[in-house]
Amino acid sequence: MMDTFMKGCRAIARGGFLRRLIGDRKGVAAVEFALIAPVLLTLYFVTMEVAQAIETNKKISRVASMVADLVTQQQSINRQEIDAIMTIGETILVPYNRSQPVIDITAIEVTDDNNPRAEVMWSRRLSNGGTGIGSPVGSTAQIPESLRIPGSFLIRVSGQLNYRPVISWTAEQRSSLGLLGACDQIRMNETYCLRPRMSRDIPCGNC
């Protein structure tokens, strides 16, 4: 009889403990935060990366536009002036500094014949922080068909950047991430073709 009573008391005690345990809400907020915090942090960093990438892409377009505008305002130009303009263009990307842009300035003349050809007259390039010769003189340049007017002269400026996010991956991580690893570098580029404003063409004596 006593054994049965004691067993019943223990069962009730256990049942009460379980009910209290199930009904206890202490620490729920901490557990929920621990579960949702990684998701919130991921969303924050993704949003930050997307915003920075969009802003940097706009700046690349601004670089090409500004450089083309400055060059086409000249009646003639020299290598030192071209290099200075490209260096000014590079500073537009500040404070982004995780990779360096490539800026190409190419003077193009469309031949005046039955089959017009876009021919490079001179070309300069800024790459890896240094300047040098771009496309070979006399080579064929790629321009839109709408601009292939016989006897015309164009300045083509292209800006390129391999955008690197704040969070980047190692080679081993890229291979394991698969498609996600492709976001380690985002290629951005913009090209502008403008005509000279002050003269028919813009010669460069020492390019």
Segments the model singles out, each with a brief description of its role:
Residues 16, 24, 41, 150-152:
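Alpha-helical hydrophobic/aromatic positions enriched in membrane-embedded helices and signal peptides
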Residues 2-4, 65-207:
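Short, conserved structural patches
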Residues 1-26:
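N-terminal leader/signal peptides at the extreme start of proteins
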Residues 40, 57, 168-170:
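Short, function-defining helix-loop hinge/capping sites that tune catalysis or transport
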Residues 28, 43-75:
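Aliphatic-rich helix starts adjacent to a transmembrane/signal segment
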